[in-house]
Amino acid sequence: MKEIVIWPAYFDLKRTKNEGRKVPKSFGVLNPKLKDIVSIIEKMGHEYSIDNKKSYPKEPWEICGYLKVTIDEKTSKLDFLKELCKRMK
């Protein structure tokens, strides 16, 4: 198992790749919220921890929080993010 960090900015349709979006626009969602991501990860059955008091490094003035999620070694971070996006829509 490996641990990955997930920021809501990774899914934000309004952001460019340079601004931190990690998934293709076709997978993106508008204004992703940490609580929505948490509920999906809970349904998927993954272990996670939340840090609500951190700001995304590209926007240090905005506190949005992040998740640390435990996933299978064989699963890539991008594949996991895409699966989350499918479930968010």
Curated annotation (Swiss-Prot):
<dbReference type="InterPro" id="IPR002778">
    <property type="entry name" value="Signal_recog_particle_SRP19"/>
</dbReference>
<comment type="subunit">
    <text>Part of the signal recognition particle protein translocation system, which is composed of SRP and FtsY. Archaeal SRP consists of a 7S RNA molecule of 300 nucleotides and two protein subunits: SRP54 and SRP19.</text>
</comment>
<keyword id="KW-0694">RNA-binding</keyword>
<keyword id="KW-0963">Cytoplasm</keyword>
<dbReference type="GO" id="GO:0008312">
    <property type="term" value="F:7S RNA binding"/>
</dbReference>
<comment type="function">
    <text>Involved in targeting and insertion of nascent membrane proteins into the cytoplasmic membrane. Binds directly to 7S RNA and mediates binding of the 54 kDa subunit of the SRP.</text>
</comment>
<dbReference type="GO" id="GO:0048500">
    <property type="term" value="C:signal recognition particle"/>
</dbReference>
<keyword id="KW-0733">Signal recognition particle</keyword>
<dbReference type="Pfam" id="PF01922">
    <property type="entry name" value="SRP19"/>
</dbReference>
<keyword id="KW-0687">Ribonucleoprotein</keyword>
<dbReference type="GO" id="GO:0006617">
    <property type="term" value="P:SRP-dependent cotranslational protein targeting to membrane, signal sequence recognition"/>
</dbReference>
<dbReference type="InterPro" id="IPR036521">
    <property type="entry name" value="SRP19-like_sf"/>
</dbReference>
<comment type="similarity">
    <text>Belongs to the SRP19 family.</text>
</comment>
<protein>
    <recommendedName>
        <fullName>Signal recognition particle 19 kDa protein</fullName>
    </recommendedName>
</protein>
<dbReference type="InterPro" id="IPR022938">
    <property type="entry name" value="SRP19_arc-type"/>
</dbReference>
